[in-house]
From Swiss-Prot:
Assembly with partners or alone: Monomer.
HAMAP family: RNase_H (MF_00042)
Protein name in the entry: Ribonuclease H
Residues at which Mg(2+) 2 binds: D16, D142
Species of origin: Saccharopolyspora erythraea (strain ATCC 11635 / DSM 40517 / JCM 4748 / NBRC 13426 / NCIMB 8594 / NRRL 2338)
Location (main, coarse): cytoplasm
Catalysed reactions, as listed in the record: Endonucleolytic cleavage to 5'-phosphomonoester
Binding site for Mg(2+) 1: D16, E54, D77
MF-aspect GO terms: magnesium ion binding; nucleic acid binding; RNA-DNA hybrid ribonuclease activity
CC annotations in GO: cytoplasm
Subcellular compartments: Cytoplasm
Length: 155
């Protein structure tokens, strides 16, 4: 497969989470891009944390892909998500979902779901994006996450 054709089969997910208070009402947002097609998604919960919403954004973005994709590029401003998936998860799985300090992994249910969603696709790349720094898609994902949070506050 050529580099050009693999790029055409790639999906970009721009994700963000937002929370008022920690814990408190929170929301997640995703901008999904496949070629020239875009989709925006968001949701929220009445009592959650910022880390749960950051994880949920990635999970929901991947879950929205109804077929396996050869290349998914995930753009997140969450170092928690980025380090969790690229540095910590292998050890957590090896240790039965315990940290190196033998404590249960926080948000293990979401990490397991993320691991499962990642397994449905080919290559997944992770890119950290500085939050609130004018990155257009990250700003859109942030607005969606805030919308989800605001709607959760009202319910």
């Amino acid at each position: 497969m050529t580099q050009h054709s693999s790029a055409q089969n790639a999906v970009d997910l721009y994700t963000d989470g937002a929370c008022s208070g920690n814990p408190g009402p929170g929301g997640w947002g995703v901008v999904l891009r496949y070629g020239h097609h875009e989709r925006e998604m968001y949701g929220g919960e009445t009592a959650t944390t910022n880390n749960k919403m950051e994880l949920t954004a990635v999970i929901e973005g991947l879950a929205a892909l109804t077929r396996p994709v050869p290349l998914v590029r995930i753009h997140t401003d969450s170092t928690y998500v980025l380090k969790g998936i690229t540095e910590w998860m292998r050890g957590w799985k090896r240790n039965g979902w315990l940290t190196s300090a033998k404590q249960p992994v926080k948000n293990a249910d979401l990490w397991r779901r993320l691991d499962q969603e990642c397994g449905r696709h080919g290559e997944i790349t992770w890119e950290w994006v500085k939050g609130h720094a004018g990155h257009p898609e990250n700003e859109r994902a942030d607005k969606l996450a805030c919308k989800g949070r605001d709607e959760a506050k009202k319910s």
